[in-house]
């Protein structure tokens, strides 16, 4: 594609990178990413994807901005309190990069709409704060054949992972899905939420930025994919660990004899 002078200036630091260049930046401008959740992780994720020039960003969230969100959800402002999060995020992203198309989905993702929501996107990024939605998004991405970059955070601890179990190599081997790591969601109430246990706001920014980096790498096809690995962050200890994870042959979703054939198990 031919860049305008403004685009050359806006994306100059990307174009200078040998691994990106003009071809890579053009690929980003054609790319489509769905971000599930416009909260603590979704905020920095959306900001950096928009700044990077990802051409189309979808935002799924049914919540409204609350004062308690602003300690970490930096895509929203005090003036946006009471507004739908998807609309607040769209306004902020337009101010950062008006070239980006932002599609708002003011709804809760569920088994009845998940496949339709993710169908029009290349990569899905999950920044939600509950196990039920993480399992749903994982299952939906597997069935739809979409790469999923997911993150989770609580208190001072976080995890980031990429799942693309739908892609097999020439030997038929594939990476893990979320269910290969955690077979089922824990009983409701067993693991506290951020609203119950708290979360360090700045850590959301760091982890969301790392998640954005992994999304950009997947879109560009550069670097080492996190598929097959799990990054564990200890904010208090200032440590990162990269743990190898393998596909589980007994996984009920992507294993050798899967028992999950659709999203019906997620129905209320």
For each of these PLM feature ranges, what is it?
Residues 1-268:
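Adenine nucleotide-associated cytosolic modules
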